[in-house]
Amino acid sequence: MISAVKSEEGRVLIAPFSKNLIGRPYIILKWAQSSEGYITSKGTQSKLSNPFSDTLTHIWRSELDGILVGHNTVRIDNPRLDVRHVSGANPHPVVLSNDTESLRESYIFNQEKVPYVYSYDHPNEMLSDLFSKGIYRLLVEGGAKTHKYFIEHNLWDEARIIRTKVQLDKGIRSPRIQGKRYKSLKVASDTIDYLRPFD
């Protein structure tokens, strides 16, 4: 039993380095979802995770090199993608979009670190380019379309799902993902499940 636990711990520790050896970032998917499994209300921003989970998310951001969101997340949420709740360096913003002109007034296009922008067309080339720019650990924060994009291309190494008790009568369903849960963390009213792909 002890050797099995040690083996699992070792796998988690070396996982980021194993992906770096093949020239792409270690990719962490992260989202919060309602008690019914919705990631957000349709067309509007929805606050789901509690303040303690928010602080933990900012700690994660401070530990990573880049943070990626899709076009709709920028358009609807206008996120800062920074670490304002904790000390540390802001990760470099990355945006997936085929039309950034409509996003130019958003916050992340008017800050010190200019976002790296990519289309949805060539995911492997995008990841290789990010790696060449020093993005060795990448946090994907959404939205649902963007998470689905990475899952369908089998381009994820870890998922951190914040399960909340917030209720949304309707909305956009959270991504469907299959993986092995290797850790679960209770954060006040939220529960965070850590998954990795099946071997």
Question: What role is predicted for each listed range?
Answer:
Residues 1-199:
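Enzymes that bind and transform nitrogen-containing heteroaromatic metabolites
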